[in-house]
Design a protein with these regions (language model features):
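Extended alpha-helical, oligomerization-prone segments that build pores/tubes and scaffolds
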Residues: 1-462
């Protein structure tokens, strides 16, 4: 279904096209999703704060304000907040569920600086910082002169030398922050028994990582070098539908072994690891049919407190993790409207370029096949050539198309009137009636926004 939704959104051909006939694909799925998305994003980003923490008591007011400021700063400044919301909501509207991943990431920040004319004391002070490393050094030595201009000597009779250093240093610092990223639907795995992420016995993030990235994450280098390359993720139905030929973002064939990509599963499993009979949540990294090990060769099975994934669904189905999307509600309408539109255009083509009936032996065929403005067709009798009349069915098709538009607006809550694009709504209608119609159309969108807020968005900021 997700592949079908993507193909419908991108207006891909159905495979039933006939050469010489209309091959148009209408865009009901895209219209519904792109029509609902601006309202949803505006609801969450219309104010200065995307999230506001409410104090439970008078003593909590200061901490609640601080939490509000911090979380909004992290979401909007440390991360691309609006872009994350856009892709999160769009995944949900298009592919049933949208998923984001929030986790703490430590990155090594490397900077280079150059210093000139440093004395020995200044150099020693600079290198007292353990994060500093000299990568290039040029030292000049010259004797110190006394007042008479002669070289000065110390108590041991050795000439006093002064050193000037020109150096290039490299500073390494670990920078940590909260990272929020969108997870493509095909990369997110969850148990079929799950109703929510929190109660699922198995959740995993399936992704392609280079050997270099795995080594930098602290996994055993020898094991990483022996992992088999894989590209199964590139051939999932959703990935094939999303990317055209040659657009795949992953490339397993490279001459540099460190840049070869491995299919890695970051798994969160509920299991009894200590033999006490109580399941706990553990994090396991899995690739090439083996559990990844740390630098010392020990399997990295770590007990964790939470699963870092947060999901939203626009039309949830009770007691199920996967609900419905707007694409599910409109994909059949797009097929029907595409069929009707194609037939209407084919009929219009035949009406404008009608076929000709000619009595054999009564008409010069060469004249008939040479279609020129004002041309002459030589015939032996006046009725030897006649035009085959094709009935125009467009007038009957337009009411059907309007009916389908009405069905779509009822299913999705998205219509030209709700978006302010239908001027006929304002004709001979009172202001109260217009407001009532707009509120009715916005009801479904507001419900989706409320569901988003109470599910994934709320859990993200906890």
């Amino acid at each position: 279904q997700r592949k079908q939704a993507l193909e419908a959104y991108l207006r891909q051909p159905y495979g039933t096209e006939i050469e010489g006939k209309s091959q148009i694909v209408t865009g009901e799925v895209a219209e519904a999703i792109d029509g609902a998305l601006p309202s949803l994003v505006r609801i969450f980003t219309g104010s200065d704060n995307i999230v506001v923490f409410e104090p439970q008591g008078p003593r909590d007011e200061a901490s609640a304000k601080q939490a509000t400021d911090y979380c909004n700063w992290v979401f909007n400044r440390d991360n691309e907040g609006v872009a994350i919301l856009h892709d999160w909501f769009k995944d949900a509207l298009l592919q049933k569920n949208g998923v984001v991943k929030a986790y703490w990431s430590d990155e090594e920040n490397i900077t280079k600086e150059r210093y000139f004319n440093l004395s020995n004391d200044e150099l020693a002070m600079l290198m007292s910082d353990d994060s500093m490393e000299i990568v290039e050094q040029d030292t000049e030595e010259f004797p110190i002169l006394d007042q008479m201009g002669n070289p000065a000597f110390d108590q041991m009779g050795q000439p006093v030398i002064n050193s000037i250093h020109n150096i290039t240093v490299q500073q390494k610092k670990m920078v940590g922050k909260v990272t929020i990223e969108n997870v493509p639907p095909e990369e997110f795995l969850i148990s079929k028994k799950a109703r929510t992420i929190a109660d699922s016995p198995f959740v995993a993030h399936r992704q392609m990582l280079t050997r270099s990235t795995l080594t930098a994450m602290g996994f055993n280098k020898k094991q990483v070098e022996g992992l088999q390359m894989g590209d199964a993720l590139a051939y999932t139905p959703e990935r094939v539908a999303r990317y055209a030929a040659g657009e795949q973002p992953y490339q397993t064939q490279t001459d540099d072994p460190s840049m070869q990509e491995i299919e890695v599963f970051e798994c969160y499993i509920k299991t009894d690891i200590d033999g006490k009979g109580i399941a706990s949540l553990v994090q396991v990294f899995y690739a090439s049919n083996e559990i990844l090990e740390d630098a010392k060769g020990k399997e990295m099975v770590e007990e964790v407190d939470y699963v870092p994934f947060h999901s939203i669904c626009p039309i949830p189905i009770p007691h199920k993790f996967f609900g419905n999307s707007l694409a599910d509600r409109t994909v059949d309408l797009q097929l029907i409207k595409t069929t009707i539109t194609r037939q209407m255009l084919d009929n219009l083509y035949l009406t404008n370029n009608a076929r000709v009936v000619a009595i054999e032996g009564q008409v010069n065929i060469d004249d008939l096949l040479t279609s020129t403005a004002g041309g002459v067709i030589r015939a032996k009798s006046q009725g030897a050539v006649s035009q085959l009349v094709v009935q125009n069915v467009a007038q009957a098709a337009f009411p059907m198309l309007q009916y389908l538009d009405t069905i779509q607006s009822k299913r999705t809550g998205v219509s030209d009137a709700s978006q302010g694009l239908d001027p006929s709504v304002l004709q001979n209608v009172t202001a109260a009636a217009v407001a009532s119609m707009q509120q009715a159309g916005a009801g479904k969108i507001e419900l989706m926004a409320r569901i988003f807020a109470e599910t994934g968005v709320k859990s993200l900021f906890k």
